[in-house]
Amino acid sequence: MFKIKQVADLKWNYILSSHRLKLMHWSTLAISTCIIFSIIANIRAPDFIRILFYLLSGFLIYKLHLKLKHLRYEADYYLILRESLLYVLHTNRLYTTYKDSSGYEKIIRSATLEYELDRQKGHVLIKALITGDEFSKKVQSLDDVLAGVLELELDEKIIRPSFVEYHFFYKKPERLVLQSHNQKQEIDNLDINLGYGVIFNPIKCPHILVSGGTGSGKSIFISVLILEFFKRKSTIYIADPKNSDLGSLSHYLGDKYVATTPNNIARIVRLVVEEMQERYQYMRDNFQYGSNFADHGFKPVWLLVDELGAFQASAGTDKKSKETIVEVMDGIKQIILLGRQAGIFILVSAQQMRAETLNTDLRDNLGLRIALGANSNEGYRMVFGSATPDKLKPIEEKGAGYLYMQGSGKETAQYWESPYLDTAQFDFIKELQLYLTETN
């Protein structure tokens, strides 16, 4: 098939357009029909033979129509997109004209918009070139114009030295729907599908921060992660100072792995830090260049700290209580900074991730950051920092929010919907019990 130049520039004269392609389609069919039927009409043969030829010709013409329609369908995406971008350039006067001696006006310079189309993902990428001319400033602020002409919501905008990227999706990513299983699943790799095209791997992107108020779906999402961790033979420790949903899991995991009081929380943090130190000692004694915990046969260990702010507030003001807080926060700091290579990971959750709860330097070392539910601009900044998007869409679905994953290629947090779990159909405790015989 012919290749369509994926550039919109008003200086160029484009031979092919969606309208011309449509004319070519129907003209080809009309001419082919006339030629074939004329030939059949001049054939000297019995009438029933000619009727058979007419029927066969009609079938062939129909097949030709389908083939041309398919080719046109494939090309129309690119042509209509190019024509839309040319319309943007023209109506926003992103060009310079020159009148020759006869008074004829000619475009001598134009802003240039390149585009790429990924039909499998439903993704449109538009690159507005920055060339240092008078249009370079204007092409950096085409957000609303492009969104309007494409009738799509802008997903992400990235300003690079020589061009501006505008990302759009015309296919909504699929939200993951969890299904019940009657038997235990064992997964060897650490990739976790979070839906919406997000694959999380703690080795590549260590540690998780989850922020969300009451009714945001935070507890359900953490429950989903607990099952995913168990499927990968992880050991899980839970600190829940509010003794709420996660704290109640002590009935199934045991008090060794679930803590709700300050002293017990300090105990499990100490256990995790000691495990990390022992692993590092083992890896030093059995040194392999470039290796990590998995190369030495270790499985992941996860420390889940729910409502970190509540823990800091729950301890008393006496000296011993303060020492407990300092010990726990120091252990959390060690895990965040040193845990990845040893396979020790942490998930920190809070209703609001204030700097007093976790300082920004440590927050930025949490590779996967999620803010569930509606939030204020300040609330998003406390979670995402410099990765907070300029424009935020309203959160209308329970379990929806914004997600930022380091190393994903995204410069800002993206709208995301957490895996859907129908509590009426999905028995979390029953699923959990499948994994309690050989883990924890």
Language model region names:
Residues T235-Y237, L249-W302:
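Mechanochemical coupling/switch segment within NTP-driven translocation systems
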Residues M1-S234, E278-Q281, V301-L304, G309-S314, ...:
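Accessory regions of macromolecular translocation/handling assemblies
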Residues L146, V210, D240, V272, ...:
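Residue-level signature of catalytic and energy-coupling elements of molecular machines
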Residues K137-D144, S349-N440:
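Conserved ATP-driven motor cores of ASCE-family P-loop NTPases powering translocation/secretion/packaging/pilus
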Residues K233-T235, F298-W302, G339-V348:
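Loop/turn-to-beta-strand initiation segments
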Residues I268-M276, E323-L347, N375:
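Substrate-engagement module of ASCE P-loop NTPases
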Residues S244, A310-S314, L338, R354-A355:
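Residues immediately C-terminal
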Residues I238, N243-L249, R354-T360:
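Short, glycine/polar-rich helix-capping loops at beta-to-alpha or helix-loop-helix junctions
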